[in-house]
């Protein structure tokens, strides 16, 4: 007989010999907190799928001033690029399963339409965005040394709309809304278990509002305060 761990469902089992009158019998035994490391991989994959393309208004910036290289003319563009590299490390409540994950996200977008009022202060922007995300997570059990690797690769397409009360002076209220449709391919590969593949897709939406108030200025620059709130549906 061997005391190697065996997997079934969400738990790891080990072969143990009975005691006393049952010493001639062998049993598969598990503890409530002795879960498979694949659980950590599934959780890491799901977190990546749900949050990779979640943004705030400040993540997308606004107009960017630049000087044309060939003509020297000053111009502006609404094109923006978001690049994110992220590392996470966590463990389950029992401390038996630990997970480390790395993620890379790239998003690009820009306005397709913009409107201003007669004073050119209030402004409404409408834009499109697209992105790619990749994540890799390694989970391992401190009980038996088993480990699991989870990976995700996905794309997103979305649209956003932003209203500013005073875009010129960058003060006052603002409201930002966006939705994003994403689709992912995910894998989970554990020790002595076949690789599991699955697909995920879904729609995520956000509504954000805030107010920017200038507090003052000095030789080093201007000082602002901006209370804000965001509600995300996923």
For the regions a language model picked out, list residue spans one by one.
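Acidic surface patches and DE-rich sequence motifs
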Residues: 20, 68, 72, 117
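Intrinsically disordered, low-complexity segments enriched in small/polar residues
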Residues: 11, 24-25, 40, 64, ...
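Short, small-residue-biased leader/transition segments that mark boundaries at the very start
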Residues: 1-4
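Outer-membrane beta-barrel biogenesis signature
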Residues: 31-75, 217-220
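Membrane translocator/pore-forming domains, dominated by Gram-negative outer-membrane beta-barrels
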Residues: 32-39, 74-78, 82-234
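Low-complexity acidic/polar repeat-biased segments
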Residues: 6-34
């Amino acid at each position: 007989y061997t005391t190697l761990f065996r997997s079934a469902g969400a738990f790891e089992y080990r072969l143990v010999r009975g005691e006393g009158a049952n010493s001639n019998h062998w049993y598969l035994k598990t503890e409530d907190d002795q879960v498979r490391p694949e659980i950590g991989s599934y959780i890491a994959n799901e977190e990546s799928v749900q949050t990779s393309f979640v943004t705030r208004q400040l993540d997308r910036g606004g107009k960017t001033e630049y000087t044309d290289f060939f003509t020297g003319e000053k111009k502006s563009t609404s094109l923006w690029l978001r690049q994110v590299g992220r590392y996470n490390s966590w463990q389950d409540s029992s401390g038996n399963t630990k997970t480390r994950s790395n993620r890379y996200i790239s998003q690009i977008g820009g306005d397709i339409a913009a409107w201003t009022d007669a004073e050119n202060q209030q402004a409404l922007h409408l834009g499109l965005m697209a992105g790619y995300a990749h994540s890799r997570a390694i989970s391992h059990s401190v009980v038996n040394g088993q480990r699991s690797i989870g990976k995700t690769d996905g794309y997103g397409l979305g649209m956003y709309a932003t209203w500013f009360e005073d875009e010129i002076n960058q003060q006052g209220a603002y409201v930002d809304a966006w939705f994003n449709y994403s689709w992912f391919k995910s894998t989970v590969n554990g020790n002595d278990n076949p690789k599991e593949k699955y697909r995920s897709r879904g729609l995520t939406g956000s509504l954000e509002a805030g107010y920017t108030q200038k507090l003052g200025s000095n030789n080093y620059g201007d000082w602002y305060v901006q209370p804000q709130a965001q509600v995300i549906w996923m």
